[in-house]
Amino acid sequence: MPDPILLTPGPLTTSATTRHAMQHDWGSWDAAFNQLTASVCADLVAIAHGGDEYVCVPMQGSGTFSVEAALGTLVPRDGVVLVPDNGAYCARILKILGRLGIEAIALPFGEDAAVDPAAIEAAFAREPRITHVAQVHLETSAGVLNPLDDIAAVCRRHGKRLIVDAMSSFGALPITLAGSGIDALISASGKCLEGVPGMGFAIVRREALDASEGNSPSLALDLHDQYAYLLKTGQWRFTPPTHVIAALRAALDQYLAEGGQPARGARYVDNCRTLVESMHALGFTTFLDASVQAPVIVTFHAPDHPAYDFRRFYDAVRDAGFILYPGKLTQLETFRVGCIGAIDSNDIRRAVAAIAQAVESLGIAVQRA
């Protein structure tokens, strides 16, 4: 039986080449593995256009581990962090800061609205104690893309430090760190780079990292110590996810061969366009306005019909070979379909056909061209 296609924002469908890269065992202290780590880190900084101003600090675990590591390492204990909040992953940052004992100020927005840089600027005027902003670039709850360049410009203008969760955008959307003033950008192996889950990373401004010694309350999640040890020895402080890194190396090779960010982004845009147009043809409507929709995951309004049941719908789509995101994060009844991974528009068309059949199996009519 073939593997299902994952229509989620990560983990996602990977290529056979990427999966094959995990067939080899690596010694974590061996020179060959050290070179593998170094090459991965160099490529990640290059993708972010970080130049010599930024370094990559890899971290074991999911992307959230690296988000917590960055916040705990780069924000001093007396820092005050503004968190523009338009979804679940912004809320997670607030929860992390609470656990770290760092003062946080939430700046709420609707889950269907992008963060407004002017509102951030107004928050600076109201709360001059703010030292940092922690911003999710692409809020995956509904698929909203926040205006990172404009937010970074506001932070630069007011001398505030910016930490960016780019979990679901890095590699697919254009990001240039050099000259941005961003202190750190965090992402992970199992997202738009199309690797497998298990490794996060922070691309950190050298000056910010150098100034962070002793900040982290954690041993394992201390980015400063992690990078210092890596710089000194070429090795990870603690056992690395060797197979995950080998898979990421293979995924990066494919990413570069495809044409890097412009080509990866174009494929995802094509997937997203195909998905939205095909779903509209069936009578489904999108939750977000097109102006804030990112080409990574699309939220659709669920059928307004008494026979609709998400679990039965999800199971029927799964039985047809496609895995949707299980459950809703928005306040309204919705479901989400991802556009990323080692898939193309033909896979999307087949997925939409499966969605149509699943809805009809519930006794709900859909439009047919």
Curated annotation (Swiss-Prot):
Gene3D superfamilies: Aspartate Aminotransferase, domain 1 (3.90.1150.10), Type I PLP-dependent aspartate aminotransferase-like (Major domain) (3.40.640.10). The keyword RNA-binding does not apply. One of its GO terms (biological process) is organic phosphonate catabolic process. Its cofactor is pyridoxal 5'-phosphate. Pfam families: Aminotran_5. Keywords: Aminotransferase, Pyridoxal phosphate, Pyruvate, Transferase. It is an enzyme of class 2 (transferase). It catalyses: (2-aminoethyl)phosphonate + pyruvate = phosphonoacetaldehyde + L-alanine. Its EC number is 2.6.1.37. The keyword Metal-binding does not apply. Coiled coil: none annotated. InterPro entries: Aminotrans_V_dom (IPR000192), NH2EtPonate_pyrv_transaminase (IPR012703), PyrdxlP-dep_Trfase (IPR015424), PyrdxlP-dep_Trfase_major (IPR015421), PyrdxlP-dep_Trfase_small (IPR015422), SP_NH2Trfase/AEP_transaminase (IPR024169). GO terms for molecular function: 2-aminoethylphosphonate-pyruvate transaminase activity. The modification N6-(pyridoxal phosphate)lysine is found at K191. Involved in phosphonate degradation. PANTHER family: 2-AMINOETHYLPHOSPHONATE--PYRUVATE TRANSAMINASE (PTHR42778:SF1). Homodimer. Belongs to the class-V pyridoxal-phosphate-dependent aminotransferase family. PhnW subfamily. This is 2-aminoethylphosphonate--pyruvate transaminase 1. It comes from Burkholderia lata (strain ATCC 17760 / DSM 23089 / LMG 22485 / NCIMB 9086 / R18194 / 383).
